[in-house]
C-alpha cells in the first residue's frame, strides 16, 4: 500500500506543477537596498551565489493534497548541477520503493517494486504548460537560486532583466517581460539569502510558491534545510514540505536511472 501511495504522490505533484504551473558602499541615486543601489544589490547576489556542483541530503517529505493532513515519507534528495535532480523514497530500512528523476531530457517517476514508470520529455511538458518550463528552472528552485527563464547561468550581464524594490527587511526582485509567467523572488537584505521564489501564471490565480527556511552551513555558505512548496489556484490547498538533514556536496553517486524493460 505504501509503495502505491509514494508513486501516486510523486505523479500528482508533477502534474499539479505543470498545470499551475554584508558589504558597505556609498548610497547611489534611484532605488536603494540598504546601502546599495538596485544594480549593486543584484550584482552582490549574483557574485555571492554558491554555485554548488552537487548537493545531497536525507529527506523527510510531507505532502498534503487536499488540506486534510499530510502524508509523510522518508528518503533522499540528490542533485548534480546541469545533470539531474533525484528524489528517492525509502520508507523501510533504506529500501527504495519509488523515485522521481528530473533531467534536462524530462521527468521520470518510477515505482521500483512493481517496475512501473511514467516518463515525459520536457518538450511535451512545455506544450502542456504553454511556457518555457525547463530543467534549469526546477534546478534553481531546488538549489535555492534566483534564475532567469531560458538561461542556464545567471551573470552580472543579466541585471537589467530584473526590477528590484525594497520591502521592509527584504528586497523583492521581479523578472521583466516574463511572457506567460510572472517570476518573483524575495531576499533578505541583511544576509542576501533567498527566502522565497514565486512563479505565477499571468492573468490567473495559478502559481507555485517555494519558501526556504532553517538555513544551515554548507561549505562555508548557507543552504535551506526546510523548503515549503505551495501550489496556488486549486480548489483544495496543495503543499509539499521538504525537511533536510545530513547536507553534503558529495558527487560520488549514479546520476541516471535505468528504466526497467
Where on the chain are the PLM-derived regions?
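An acidic-aromatic
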Residues: 84-136
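Bacterial signal peptide processing site
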Residues: 22-25
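A short, Trp-centered hydrophobic/proline-enriched beta-strand micro-motif
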Residues: 46-66
Amino acid at each position: 500500500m505504501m509503495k502505491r501511495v509514494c508513486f501516486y504522490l510523486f505523479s500528482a505533484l508533477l502534474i499539479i506543477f505543470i498545470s499551475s504551473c554584508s558589504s558597505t558602499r556609498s548610497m547611489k541615486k534611484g532605488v536603494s537596498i540598504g546601502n546599495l543601489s538596485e544594480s549593486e544589490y543584484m550584482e552582490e547576489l549574483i557574485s555571492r551565489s554558491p554555485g554548488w556542483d552537487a548537493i545531497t541530503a536525507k529527506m523527510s517529505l510531507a505532502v498534503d493534497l487536499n488540506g486534510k493532513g499530510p502524508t509523510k515519507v522518508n528518503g533522499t534528495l540528490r542533485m548534480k548541477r546541469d545533470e539531474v535532480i533525484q528524489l528517492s523514497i525509502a520508507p523501510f530500512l533504506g529500501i527504495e520503493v519509488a523515485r522521481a528523476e528530473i533531467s534536462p531530457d524530462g521527468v521520470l517517476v518510477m515505482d521500483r517494486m512493481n517496475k512501473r514508470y511514467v516518463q515525459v520529455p520536457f518538450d511535451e511538458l512545455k506544450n502542456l504548460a504553454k511556457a518555457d518550463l525547463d530543467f534549469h528552472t526546477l534546478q534553481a528552485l531546488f538549489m535555492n537560486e534566483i534564475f532567469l527563464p531560458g538561461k542556464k547561468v545567471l551573470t552580472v550581464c543579466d541585471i537589467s532583466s530584473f526590477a528590484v524594490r525594497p520591502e521592509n527587511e527584504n528586497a523583492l526582485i521581479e523578472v521583466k517581460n516574463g511572457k506567460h509567467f510572472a517570476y518573483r523572488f524575495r531576499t533578505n537584505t541583511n544576509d542576501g539569502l533567498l527566502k522565497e521564489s514565486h512563479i505565477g501564471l499571468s492573468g490567473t490565480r495559478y502559481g507555485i510558491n517555494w519558501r526556504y527556511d532553517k538555513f544551515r552551513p554548507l561549505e562555508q555558505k548557507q543552504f535551506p534545510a526546510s523548503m515549503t512548496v505551495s501550489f496556488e489556484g486549486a480548489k483544495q490547498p496543495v503543499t509539499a514540505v521538504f525537511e533536510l538533514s545530513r547536507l553534503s556536496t558529495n558527487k560520488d553517486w549514479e546520476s541516471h536511472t535505468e528504466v526497467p524493460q
